[in-house]
Design a protein with these regions (language model features):
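Beta-strand-rich domains and repeat architectures in extracellular enzymes and scaffolds
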Residues: 26-51
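Repeated scaffold domains used in trafficking and secretory/extracellular systems
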Residues: 33-39, 67-74, 112-119, 155-165, ...
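Short loop/turn segments immediately following the C-termini of beta-strands
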Residues: 51, 86, 123, 131, ...
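Short loop/turn segments that connect beta-strands within beta-propeller blades
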Residues: 58, 95-99, 140-143, 180-184, ...
Length: 219
């Protein structure tokens, strides 16, 4: 345990030594035990989950109890937030004020899709993982069609996937993948450390397991 703690201290001290970190006090927001802070945008706006409602500060919220619990919220583009409800295979796109722009109900598609995760692609596209055939696909949520010839097969059970627009990073229990805009795998590395989560720091990748944090340079 002491060795793991030392690793984290050295890791973060290395970041602090090369990057000026400034902490600013934010305005107080009234919360209770049911609030879960899930994100903060570049303007300092805070996003919470409260009793399965998505809230932005104290003024804006989105809720649709008919879709069950919120599985994931993708904040990469704050003007097109993606709210994923896996139980009902439904994606809801929200604007900056949490008003609904559109929604996708994959259960109503002509083919059978078992979407278990989503991540932003570009302006009107998202990446989805279809468990029915273990493939990464790209979907145009405005025209509600899949992009032809983008169906990337991955090996292992999906753990996490995140995009920084330029690339999609996919983590399974076997491998870490880096996938380009066209769905081509350009990087594949064994998941030997048992990573459970992908994060971004500037242009680099952070990987974490249950006790350690790793820094992967994105060259």
């Amino acid at each position: 345990m002491r060795a793991q703690l030392l690793f984290l201290i050295v890791f973060f001290n290395s970041f602090l030594a090369h990057n000026q970190i400034i902490l600013n006090k934010i305005e107080s927001i009234k919360t209770n035990d049911s609030y879960e802070l899930i994100s903060a945008d570049s303007l300092g706006e805070l996003f919470f989950l409260e009793d399965n409602n998505l809230r932005k500060g104290e003024d804006y919220f989105f809720s649709d109890s008919s879709l069950g619990p919120i599985t994931k919220v993708d904040f990469y583009n704050n003007f097109k937030l993606k709210v994923w409800y896996q139980d009902f295979n439904t994606l809801v796109i929200l604007d900056n004020y949490l008003n609904e722009i559109t929604r996708v109900q994959f259960n109503k598609a002509s083919s059978v899709f078992e979407i278990s995760d989503i991540s932003s692609a570009n302006e009107n596209d998202i990446w989805v993982y279809d468990e029915s055939n273990m493939r990464i696909k790209k979907f145009d949520f405005f025209n509600q069609v899949f992009t032809e010839n983008v169906h990337t097969l991955i090996d292992g059970n999906l753990i996490d996937m995140k995009s920084n627009y330029n690339y999609l990073w996919v983590l399974t229990d076997k491998y870490l993948y880096k996938i380009n805009y066209n769905g081509l795998i350009i990087f594949k590395k064994e998941n030997k450390i048992g990573s459970k989560k992908i994060g971004f720091y500037k242009n680099d990748i952070l990987l974490s397991n249950e006790s350690e944090l790793y820094h992967l340079e994105n060259n």
